[in-house]
């Protein structure tokens, strides 16, 4: 069984058994449930203003949804199922076709939609696909909202629209241009400086929609010398699509053979960004957010946020400017919530996810590229020189499977108690901060697994810390 329902939506491998994999039936059920959820919200708002007996039909006629997808092989099939289901619910559909996750998020705002569905399994292999759900702000639904949507998938009282109330369909192909235009209008994006720098850039777009969006962005920024690796939008990923070191040998080798200034790698839906220096060495995806934040904080003093499993390098940069860094629970929706609470000017996740609220509250590789190129252009520094400004921290990641009978909450409590003499954060699992290192222990939302993240000034120390926590877990379960 691969079908996983979580706070970000539903995902699974294509085909197989209904309810166990991502089948057409599951796509229709989940799309219907999300539509019902949005209709419920609309009706609750409207009921205080109208007592019309035909309220539901009126509400449906006003509903608008944006749909976008990455280039996965199954994407066009899932897209047709999603759009047809929404129309059958009486909802107007704005279909972006091939798009990116941040572009779809932006389109929800720009099209004044009630919500959106992104058809992408992000960095998962090509046999996977997923539906990710957006509210009317172009942000992911909350955990509580996701629970309600899952409950609605089991309802047998859903009413589809009658023939005279079916929703309309519009294919909108300018969403990427709209997104790029909004980025170019940001005060901290300096097109003139980037154009004058005459950068030579190489991209790895993993045969997905980065190949659509990134060349458009770079052209508008005045970058004319661009090489694209894996630029066919056929959904056949040339390598494991997660932008982590073991998957990026191709672009690193290409850079070492030519005179590029910088390389950018994105995942299939373009919400994560990895950077490669002019020497063909990895910038380290944990430092994508760090460098972009450094540039933003130079010009816009303010607070920062990243999740508890992200590098402490962001805190170092934030401290440099006398501002406040706040960690959040893992998950984009949690990062965004904390950013709003603390009025953060920049935030994100250490997996290369940059969230710049001046544009929108969502991870966005396009705005990350625009801000980073501006940083390079205005500082006059090479990519590698920018990376050298920051301390070298090393993160080690481990996981251990648990028997389904294990009380994970109690286990995490025992770990917190064992390390109570140190600084302990219980917002999401247990994070323990030592003098110059930390470890984060948390349970998976979908599997009986404990994940362990440790960071230190050397890889061996980080590995020792993670291994010690693995040993503690085994001991506490005995």
Regions found by a protein language model. Give the residues of each.
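Short glycine-centered, acidic/aromatic-flanked micro-motifs in structured strand/loop junctions
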Residues: 67-69, 203-205, 277, 358, ...
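N-terminal small/polar loop signature for handling phosphorylated ligands or for N-terminal nucleophile
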Residues: 36, 51-56, 61-128, 216-276
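Phosphate-binding and adjacent anionic-ligand microenvironments
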Residues: 262, 300-478
């Amino acid at each position: 069984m691969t079908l996983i329902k979580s706070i970000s939506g539903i995902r699974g491998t294509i085909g197989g058994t209904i309810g166990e994999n991502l089948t057409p039936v599951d796509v229709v059920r989940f799309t219907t449930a999300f539509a019902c959820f949005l209709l419920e919200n609309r009706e609750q708002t409207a009921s205080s203003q109208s007592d019309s007996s035909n309220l539901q039909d009126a509400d449906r006629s006003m509903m608008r949804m944006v749909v976008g997808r990455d280039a996965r092989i199954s994407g066009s099939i899932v897209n047709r199922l999603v759009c047809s289901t929404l129309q059958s619910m009486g909802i107007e559909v704005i279909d972006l076709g091939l798009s990116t996750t941040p572009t779809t998020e932006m389109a929800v705002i720009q099209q004044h939609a009630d919500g959106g569905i992104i058809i992408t399994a992000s960095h998962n292999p090509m046999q996977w696909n997923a539906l990710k759900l957006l509210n009317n702000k172009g942000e992911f639904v909350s955990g509580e909202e996701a629970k309600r949507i899952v409950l609605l998938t089991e309802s047998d009282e859903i009413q589809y629209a009658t023939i005279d109330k079916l929703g309309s369909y519009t294919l909108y192909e300018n969403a990427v241009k709209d997104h790029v235009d909004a980025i170019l209008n940001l005060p901290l994006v300096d097109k003139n400086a980037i154009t004058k720098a005459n950068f030579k850039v190489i991209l790895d777009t993993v045969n997905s929609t980065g190949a659509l969006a990134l060349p458009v962005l770079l052209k508008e920024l005045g970058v004319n010398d661009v090489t694209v690796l894996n630029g066919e939008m056929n959904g056949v990923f040339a390598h494991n699509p997660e932008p982590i070191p073991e998957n990026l040998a191709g672009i690193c080798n290409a850079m070492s053979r030519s005179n590029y200034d910088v390389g950018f790698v994105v995942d299939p839906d373009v919400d994560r960004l990895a950077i490669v220096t002019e020497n063909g060495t990895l910038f380290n995806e944990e430092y994508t957010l760090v460098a972009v934040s450094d540039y933003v904080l130079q010009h816009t003093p303010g607070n920062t946020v990243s999740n508890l499993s992200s590098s402490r390098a962001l805190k170092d940069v934030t401290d440099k400017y006398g501002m406040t860094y706040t960690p959040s629970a893992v998950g984009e929706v949690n990062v965004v919530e904390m950013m709003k609470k603390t009025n953060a000017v920049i935030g994100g996740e250490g997996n290369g996810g940059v969230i710049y609220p001046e544009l929108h509250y969502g991870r966005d590789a396009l705005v990350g590229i625009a801000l980073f190129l501006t940083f390079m252009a205005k500082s006059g520094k090479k990519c590698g020189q920018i990376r050298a400004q920051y301390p070298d921290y090393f993160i080690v990641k481990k996981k251990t499977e648990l028997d389904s009978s294990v009380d994970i909450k109690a286990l995490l409590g025992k770990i917190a108690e064992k390390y109570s003499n140190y600084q302990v954060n219980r917002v999401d699992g247990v994070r323990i901060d030592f003098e110059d290192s930390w470890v984060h222990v948390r349970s998976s939302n979908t599997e009986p697994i404990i994940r362990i993240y440790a960071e230190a000034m050397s890889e061996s120390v980080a590995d020792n810390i993670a291994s010690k926590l693995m040993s503690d877990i085994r001991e506490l379960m005995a």
